[in-house]
Each structure stands twice: as C-alpha cells, then as structure tokens.
Amino acid sequence: MANEELTESQQQEDPSQQLPNADEEKGSDSDSNSDSDASSQSSGDDFYISESENEAEGDNTIFNYVRPSDIPPDPNANPETNIRRFNRVLDGKRVKRMQEEEEDKYTFYEDLFDFPRDPERWKEQDLREIWADGPLEMTKPGWDPAWADEDDWDVVNDEIQEGRDPGIQPFYVPYRKPYPAIPDNHYDIENAKGVVEELDRIEEFLQWVSYIFPDGSSYEGTVWDDLAQGKGVYIAENGLVRYEGEWLQNDMEGHGVIDVDIPDIEPIPGSKLEAKMRAEGRIIKRDYMTPEDRKWLEMDVEDSVALTDGNFQVPFYENEEWVTQFGEKPEKGRYRYAGQWKHSRMHGCGVYEVNERILYGRFYFGELLEEEHGCTVDICALHSGLAEVAAAKARMFVNKPDGMIREERGPYGDPQHPYFYEEDDVWMAPGFINQFYEVPEYWETYVGEVDQEREMWLNSFYKAPLRLPMPAELEHWWENVEVTPEFVLLNKEPEPDPNDPSKLVQKEDPVILHTPTGRIINYVEDEKHGIRLFWQPPLEEGEEVDPSKVEFLPLGFDEFYGKEVVVKKEHPIKSFVLGIEKSVKPMLDGLEKWTEEKKKAYEERKEMIQQELELVEAEICLEEAIEDMDEELKKKEQEEEKKTEMGLTEEDEDVLVPVYKEEKVVTAKEKIQENKQEEKYKDDDDEDDDDGDDDDDDDDDDDLGPSSFGSADKGRRNSPFSSSSLSFASCTLFPAVQSRLESSFLAWKQHRAEPSKVNTGIIKGADTASASIHFPPLSSNNARLKMGKVANRGCVQRSYGSSRSQSQLMSLSRLLSCNASSSSSPPDSSSSEYLKDSGLWETPVGDMSVVLSLQIQTKCSDLFAETPAVS
C-alpha cells in the first residue's frame, strides 16, 4: 500500500515538475528561434538550416535535471574562478603524494625486459669494461679509439673544444634492436621469464643458409632475420681466416675458435729474391717437395705470372697499415684463439696460440691484459674447451646440400654427418645415417652406439603426434623425397667372379641416365682432359661406340655458352692495305711459282749444255789422240825405212837406234825450242799442282805411263813396239789400236833389209843421254816422284801434237833407247870407261828434279855392264 501511495504521489508531482521544464523548453525554443531568425537575417541567404536538421538536433538534445534548491547560485561561479580553484587542489600536497604512490606502483614497458637485480652488485669497473654514451653528433652506433676513423676523432675533438670531457677509453656499446622483436600486446610475454621462453621458441625457426659474398668470403650456418645468429662457420677470402663458433646478430659473440694463417714469403723460382734468401740461409719450402710437386708448383707460378700481366695486389698481412696501427707487421705463421668473444673481438678468458707459443689470460676487446683478473689456467682451459665444442657444432652446418658453396665447388657427398672420436679425429660419413656409404670396420662399434642415440633423437620427430619443426637436414630430405632425381646411375647385374664364384663383380662400367631427356651419358678416357662425358647414341647389339662421332658434353661455362671473342677495330688505312695485300697475294703467288718453274727449266737446260760440252771435249780429245798416233806411226815408219837403208841387223838395230838419234846435231834454234819446251812443261806441272785431286791423278797417270812398259828382266829381246801397246791402250778410247799397231810393226820387220856396219866413231863422238833415279830434298809435304828428261847436247827434242802426246812419245823413245843400247853395247872395259868418262850414266847435277823410273835405271845399268863396246 505504501508503494502504491508513493507511485501515485510521484505521478501527481510529475506534472508539476514537468511544467517548469516545459516552460523553460518553450523559452529555450523561443530563444533559439529568435536567435536563428536574427542570425538568418544577419547572414541573409548565405546560411540556411533545414527542418529535418532541426528535428534531428531536437531529438539528440540531452535534458539535464537540476534539483531545486533554496541556496541562491554563487555569483562568482565563472570559468576563471573554477580554473584557479582546480589548480590549487592539484598543487596540493595530498595530490602530489597520491601521484608519487601511483608512480612507484607503475611498471614501465622497458622494465618488463630487465633481468633480476644482481645481488652481488657488479659494476662496469668490475667487468673491466667502461660504458658510456656517445656524443649526439656520433652517427655510428659506437666507437673504439683503437679502431676509430677520422670522422670519429672529429666528433671527439669538437666535444673537447666545447668544454666537455668525453671519455677517451670508453667503448660505446652499439645499439641493438630488441631481440626478439616483441610487439607491445604480446600475450605470452609479461616478464623476463617470458622473454627467455620466447627466445627458446624462436631458436627453432632459425634458417640454415650457405652464402658466398662478392669479396670471396663465405658463411655457412644459421641466420635469423638475415643476420648471422646461432652457430656458423665463416671463411675469409683465400681461406686464410676461418671462424667456427657462436654468432649474435652478425657479431662473433659467445664461444668460438678462429684460425689465421699468415703465409711466409716464398720467392719465385730463379728470381733475385730466391738468391738473396739462400745467401741468408733461409729455408725455402720448395726444397723439401718431391720432384713432381716441385715441377707442378713451378708451372703454377709460371702460369700465375703470365696471367696477371704485370698486375699485383698487396695482401693484407703485407699492408703498411699494420705499421701505422701497431708499429710493425704481424709475425708470419699460424694464429689460433679458442675462448670467449664479444662484439667480434676476443673478450674474456681464452687460450691464444702463436706459432706453437701458448698464451692465456683475460682479453679485453682483442688485447691481452697483463693481469689475469680471474682467468687462471683452469678457467682459460674450460672456456677453450667450450669454444672447441661450439666450433664442432658449427661445423655440422657446412656443406649445405642446396647451398651456394656446394654449387660453386661442384659435386660433393650429400649431407654430411661427422663423427668425432678420441683425440679430435674426424671421419665423415656421407648421407643420412650412413645410407650411402658403409662405416669403416674399425669404427663400426662406436658408430653403432652413436647411431642408436641419434635414431632416438630422430624418432622423436618421426613419431610426434603434431607436425614439429625438424632439423634442417630432415626438412631438406622430406622436401625432395618426391622429386625425381636428375641423374640416375645405371648398372648391370653383377656376375660371379671366375676366380671366386662366391663374389659378384661388375664386368662393365656404369652409365648415367639423364632423366629429363631420357638420354644416356657415357664417358671415355682422354689424354688431354682425363675423362670426357658424351651423349651415347643408340647402339645395336655388339656395336661399340666410336668416340670420333659422338657429341661430347661441354667442359665448362666458356664452352657451353661460347667464349666471347673480342674483335678489335682496325684502322681504316690498315684495313685498306690488308685488303690490297689479300687481293694481290694470288698474283704474287702465281708469279713466284712461274719464277720457280723458269729457274728449274734453266737449270735443266744448263745441265744439258754442260753434258753436250763434255761430249764435244771427249770427241776432240779422241780426234787429237788419233792424229798423234798417226804422226807417231809415220815417224816410226820413217825410222824403220832409214834403218833398212843403213843395213842394220836386228841385234845392231836394238843398240844403235837410240845412238843414231843421239848423233843428230843440235842446232841453236833447236836448243832454244828445247828450253822453251822445258819451261812449258814446268808451267804445266805447276798448273797441275794447283788443280783438284782429279787433275793431279790424271797428270800422274800421264807422267808415270812409261813405267808400265813391259818387264825389265835381262835376256828379253822382244820388239820394243810390243810394249808400247800398253801405253797407247791407257791413253786412247779404242782398244782396237793395239792390234793395228802390232800388225803394222810386224809387216815392217819382215820387209827390212840387212843393216850395215855402223862406225864406232858415231858413238864416241856423240853426246850421251843419262837417265837416273834422284831423290832431291823437298821441303814441301806435297812432294811427289815425277819423271823428267835431261836435255844433252847430242839429243834433240821434237814437238808432236799436244803436251799429252809429247810426254807419251818421250817415254816410249827413252824405253826404246835403253833397250837398244843394252843389246848392242860390248862388255869391254874400254867402252865402260868411255861411258863412265862421258857421263852417260852419271846422276845429273844441274837438274835434280829430272828422274826416270826405277825399272829403267836398273835395266839400263845391267845391260851396259854386260854388253861389249862396238868396234
């Protein structure tokens, strides 16, 4: 009942309460209308409000209820007073105290990622690190005095000039973006523990990459957001620097091992530097190589020098910047550090080895401190071992199957699983769990144990109910398991070995099948390139491949794409000259050929003419010889006729014929002719000596011809003409002359008359001719024994024909005279004394070079000794 009464009373009061509001609303409407009218009148047609807009505004109007009160409104309730009152309240102590309490309770966003406070209260000085903020003008994330450049020092000098005191030694920590990149509204991260868990999850999404950079360096390992993160291997250009270990946003940080090799200078073979080093007693590596290795090294050096074409580059270890920074160049040899790293510097505890000299201690951004500062031998050995483990884990990521390094270096066993044994021995088993190659027997036990552990680890991924990220090697294997391989190795079924049937052997070499094209690739041994691959054509049964008709695969990119040939533009004048030369060349070649043919024909014609001349000369010589023979025959015929007229017998004839010749009176004219003839003979002899061997032999044959006239035995009484046939036969071309001479001489002998007595006075009064053997002393080594004639008063020399015929006739006459004198001389003492006194057989003193043959001298002396003088 009470509630009903209350509602009724409220309903009764509502009209009374709504009336003033209605009046006010009307008043407000009237005011608004009046205002709108006034505004519309003032603005004219420029401003117009539609009725629909007025209705909308009326619907959206909020009605405020003001409780009636007996207190009159405050006359000072204006905006300025209200603002002044609010400021007095906000500046009060109570409000400030409340704000401080709220601020203390508030957790800033940056504080969410702070690790718990250090109860030991470590400071920068305790860490041997001085941290500071860089100047505002410093555009780089940080700087270090040891590695600062000119821009960094300019900023520091400006700070000093402005009166500030920037730290000279501090190392400014480079700014790093938050790791990981966590959004503000991440619901999984509320504190430091959430950050660690997020890092663990992100670690599973690291990517395995294999890069080769433009400068020749390479990196193989894990990356996060295109930055080296996790574990990896970095190899600098030429492989002189190698780092294996942990990375943090492209910086070597954590534990790792670095190997640096600074090679010693090796001189070029045969250079002045080599001679200088040998003089100093330096050791040259080439001296300890095998002959084959030394030969290959020399060829490599020769090719390198030829290809560089005079260009060279100073290596980093020979750069003068080392002297500028450190005062001297680094020591040649091997450097190795295993330990802690920070900001790509040796920072912390570690072991440093320089050419087998071991150093250990605390390193401060690459510099070894004098004091240990807690890095004792044991601590350094511990961190060195951790670095070796990190390096071994980093090496697990080398040789990525589809990486750039594998593509550059060529074929390589697919993904590698290294096994590490005692004493740091390593054996690489290609393939996933040795599926391609078997493990050596002496490692089977150890590998079996390792494989069991590895299979348990891999099975955790195989049998997982959900699809979890797997190791990179399994991801790669599963992605390519359905892909058809590009090349397949084809082998025939093995056959039993004839020597050992229990073993199966392959009798033919395998071939390669190119699956995209279906063609077979075979190979053949090549002397130049070793092994050449070629596309094998279809073969019939029993047919063999002909290497000369097959299509070989290209040896490299140059052969595949074609080596670009640089065409040099020639000068127009040079090209014009070459064109003329090319057009004229056939004409010149034809002219040269015609000249050679003419020259050859001329030489042949010349040879024919020489042969004709020789034949003509032979004919002339033959005619002269025949004429000389005819003259000699006439002479002999006249002598025989004279003998028959004188009535000499055959016995007297043999002795008196030469004496009769000697009885002839020698006139002055004949003596002059004789002297001239002798001089002519001497000149001919001198000319013959100056000629070649053929002329000397001919002259010797002519001079020594008479020595072959028969035998010189006593008691022989043959006709002197019988022996002359030998001499004529040697001088003429026709042997028929001998028979003609013999027949004519026999006919003359048969018709001769009886010879008359010859007066002995003829012999006594006549001058005798002497013939002897004489060997004068000769100073020349070319001296020879020659035959000559001694000219006496009772002997006249006549010239018949040529000199050749004269020498033959002289030899014949002398032989005949000797035979005749030997047969007719008496063996009394008076004749011998007379002959001795007359000097017939004495050795000629005036002309020592005139000699006769030894046979003639002996024969003549014996005959005169036995023949009596003619009375």
Curated annotation (Swiss-Prot):
SUPFAM superfamilies: Histone H3 K4-specific methyltransferase SET7/9 N-terminal domain. MORN repeats lie at residues 219-239, 243-257, 337-352. Its main location: plastid. Residues 632-645, 669-683 have a biased composition (Basic and acidic residues). GO terms for biological process: chloroplast organization; embryo development ending in seed dormancy; protein import into chloroplast stroma. Disruption phenotype: Severe defects during embryogenesis, producing abnormal embryos and thereby leading to a lethality of young seedlings. InterPro entries: MORN. It holds the Pfam family MORN. Keywords: Chloroplast, Coiled coil, Membrane, Phosphoprotein, Plastid, Plastid inner membrane, Protein transport, Repeat, Transport. Residues 30-46 have a biased composition (Low complexity). Residues 1-85, 631-654, 669-721 are annotated as: Disordered. Residues 8-20 have a biased composition (Polar residues). It comes from the Eukaryota. This is Protein TIC 100. The lineage of its organism: Eukaryota, Viridiplantae, Streptophyta, Embryophyta, Tracheophyta. The gene is TIC100.
